[in-house]
């Protein structure tokens, strides 16, 4: 009796759940766009087709079917896209998220009794077995359609009306399994043992989040006179130059008032001269803070003219969002609870022991600062959005709380989904990836320090094939005001051309800091820093001086703009080149109508001769086939015969090659 009571107890309140569980025979797992169990949104690009995949399977041998459903968040109607079987229980659908917005995604899967019946009866018929009862089962399956439209209902009724028990079995089966019947049943047959997956978040960025070319400058150094502070009007005069190079994002270091307390002098000196402008990252003075403009740059009227002029030149302005304050920032006086104070009553300066940053004070995100500081920082971003800025490069986001970024980016993008955040986070891999998960549309990367063939292949393979490709988009900056790469310090003009080609063609997003075009690389001895860095002084640049590489930059950006193959970073593929100093890789559209092959000599000091592989198999061609080739550096056209070819790349004349491949029958 006790055992019976126990069994009854286990049923109490659980029968409904049991029945739901029993009905869920189709398993859905391994979803490619599911990030941490749906905790974070996968990133896609609005208007781009994306492959949505999942492992879907059932017990036994019955056929199954599946569909992806998606909708824009806040709307009622789902858009259904049927999935196709790939291999090994993997299913796929191609989905386009039309709007730059938050979306939702889910899956349905079910046992397909009609297809199961059709396959089984076909086998029995082929074996010469009687199928009379099976045909009756087929009639009942056809009669079971419940959601048929008028056309499908009429088709099913016609098939049933034409069927008769006195007819030949093969003819009856052919009628019940005709292509028209199969299509109708796919649309409207009952979905037996329907399994519904959880709803997953998706964020569809605008294209600039995945494909952009950045040019970084300090507005104060654009007067062409090292003795005169630049203005926004000076920047406006430089816009044609930036656009002529082919860039589409013009990124400014901070444009706010600079603190006077503990101001840094040239080369980060602690003893500035009276006319030293200080570091733009020491934000805030009696003239204002993060929502103010440095008075020597201009005012909001001139900034508005700059934004408008940039748009007219096909450029977007990106601003630096640096959450740090100079010791005389207004917030310190108005909100002392937002900062750390030492036992002696002095404010704590920014430190990374043993380094000290005497001209910078960090905010504290908790204690008395929560929630008011969080609101204030969000409102700073929204303030600049209203001024026409839709892209923000965020300084050192890895030193601020993940919950803050998740909340702040969500707040901003809920109102302005076209806003893009770039994480300047040279940090540990997992931290960098977490920032992508919490909302950053782009991230700085380790590209700056990946110089060898093996390093580049390993790193790029990780970024383009592992799960992080669905939430972290790298931006390959070849240099920054803070990083003067060792490779460039010792490689001369050839090295600048090499790293330009790699950054521009490997990445969907890439950037250059001004001075790159004239191969500026004078270092502070023994450091990855620029000597006479314009972080601490005004500079005047002669970008037309002998040895500049403007033509290379124009060419790279032209190839990026005019070839659809360049847009999707994840379509990067590496190929064989029998030389450890040569990197071979390709990008193509899915239909292979635009197929580019790249060879880059990574050695800036010596010519390299090598045998390389022509990826004929990508076009379904045998190893002895031929392809027509266009050299995108000079426009020459010729034919490669066979899978292996030879090439020499001399870093002094031609450190890289870009080929467009045309398979037989492709339009020229």
UniProtKB/Swiss-Prot annotation:
One of its GO terms (biological process) is alpha-glucan biosynthetic process. Residues 263-288 are annotated as: Disordered. Gene3D superfamilies: Glycosidases (3.20.20.80), Golgi alpha-mannosidase II (2.60.40.1180), Immunoglobulins (2.60.40.10), Phosphotransferase system, lactose/cellobiose-type IIA subunit (1.20.58.80). SMART domains: Aamy. Alpha-maltose 1-phosphate binds at residues 264, 324, 359, 396, 535-536. It catalyses: alpha-maltose 1-phosphate + [(1->4)-alpha-D-glucosyl](n) = [(1->4)-alpha-D-glucosyl](n+2) + phosphate. Homodimer. This is Alpha-1,4-glucan:maltose-1-phosphate maltosyltransferase. It comes from Cereibacter sphaeroides (strain ATCC 17023 / DSM 158 / JCM 6121 / CCUG 31486 / LMG 2827 / NBRC 12203 / NCIMB 8253 / ATH 2.4.1.). The lineage of its organism: Bacteria, Pseudomonadati, Pseudomonadota, Alphaproteobacteria, Rhodobacterales.
């Amino acid at each position: 009796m006790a055992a019976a009571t126990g069994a009854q107890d286990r049923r109490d309140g659980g029968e409904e759940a049991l029945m739901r569980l029993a009905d869920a025979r189709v398993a859905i797992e391994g979803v490619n766009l599911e990030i941490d169990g749906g905790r974070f949104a996968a990133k896609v690009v609005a208007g781009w087709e994306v492959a949505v995949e999942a492992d879907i399977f059932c017990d036994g041998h019955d056929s199954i079917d599946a569909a992806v459903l998606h909708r824009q968040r806040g709307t009622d109607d789902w858009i259904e896209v049927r999935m196709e079987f790939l291999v090994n229980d993997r299913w796929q659908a191609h989905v386009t998220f039309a709007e730059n917005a938050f979306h939702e995604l889910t899956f349905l899967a079910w046992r397909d009794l009609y297809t199961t019946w059709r396959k089984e009866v076909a086998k029995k018929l082929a074996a010469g077995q009687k199928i009379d009862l099976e045909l009756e089962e087929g009639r009942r399956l056809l009669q079971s359609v419940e959601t048929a439209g008028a056309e499908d209902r009429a088709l099913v009724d016609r098939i049933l009306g034409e069927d008769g028990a006195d007819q030949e079995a093969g003819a009856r089966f052919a009628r019940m399994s005709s292509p028209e019947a199969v299509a109708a049943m796919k649309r409207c047959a009952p979905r037996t043992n329907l399994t519904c997956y959880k709803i997953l978040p998706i964020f569809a960025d605008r294209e600039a989040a995945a494909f952009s070319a950045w040019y970084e400058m300090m507005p104060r150094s654009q007067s062409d006179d090292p003795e005169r502070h630049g203005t926004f009007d000076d920047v406006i005069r430089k816009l044609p130059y930036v656009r002529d190079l082919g860039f589409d994002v013009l990124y400014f270091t901070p444009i706010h008032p600079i603190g006077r307390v503990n101001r840094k002098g040239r080369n980060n000196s602690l003893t500035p001269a009276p006319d030293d402008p200080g570091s733009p990252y020491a934000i805030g003075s009696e003239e204002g803070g993060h929502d103010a403009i440095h008075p020597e740059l201009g005012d909001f009227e001139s900034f508005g003219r700059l934004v408008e002029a940039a748009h007219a030149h096909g450029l977007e302005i990106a601003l630096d969002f640096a959450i740090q304050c100079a010791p005389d920032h207004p917030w310190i006086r108005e909100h002392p609870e937002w900062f750390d104070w030492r036992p002696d009553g002095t404010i704590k300066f920014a430190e990374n022991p043993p380094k000290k940053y005497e001209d910078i004070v960090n905010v504290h995100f908790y204690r008395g600062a929560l929630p008011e500081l969080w609101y204030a920082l969000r409102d700073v971003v929204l303030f600049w959005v209203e001024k026409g800025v839709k892209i923000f490069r965020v300084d050192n986001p890895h030193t601020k709380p993940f919950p803050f970024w998740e909340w702040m980016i969500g707040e901003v993008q809920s109102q302005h989904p076209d806003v893009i955040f770039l994480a300047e986070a040279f940090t540990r891999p997992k931290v960098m990836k977490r920032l992508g998960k919490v909302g950053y549309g782009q991230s700085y990367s380790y590209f700056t320090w990946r110089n060898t063939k093996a390093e580049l292949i390993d790193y790029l393979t990780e970024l383009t094939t592992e799960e992080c490709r669905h939430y972290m988009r790298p931006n390959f900056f070849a240099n920054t005001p803070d990083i003067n790469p060792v490779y460039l310090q010792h490689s001369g003009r050839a090295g600048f051309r090499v790293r330009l080609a790699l950054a521009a063609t490997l990445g969907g997003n890439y950037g250059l800091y001004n001075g790159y075009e004239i191969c500026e690389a004078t270092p502070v001895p023994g450091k990855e820093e620029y000597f006479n860095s314009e972080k601490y002084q005004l500079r005047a640049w002669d970008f037309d001086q002998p040895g500049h590489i403007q033509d290379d930059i124009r060419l790279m950006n032209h190839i990026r703009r005019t070839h659809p193959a360049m847009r999707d970073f994840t379509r990067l593929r590496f190929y064989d080149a029998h030389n450890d100093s040569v990197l071979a890789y390709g990008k193509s559209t899915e239909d292979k109508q635009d197929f580019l092959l790249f060879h880059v000599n990574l050695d800036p000091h010596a010519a390299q001769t090598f045998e390389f592989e022509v990826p004929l198999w990508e076009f379904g061609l045998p190893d002895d086939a031929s392809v027509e080739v266009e050299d995108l550096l000079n426009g020459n056209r010729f034919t490669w015969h066979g899978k292996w070819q030879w090439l020499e790349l001399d870093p002094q004349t031609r450190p890289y090659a870009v080929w467009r491949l045309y398979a037989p029958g492709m339009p020229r």
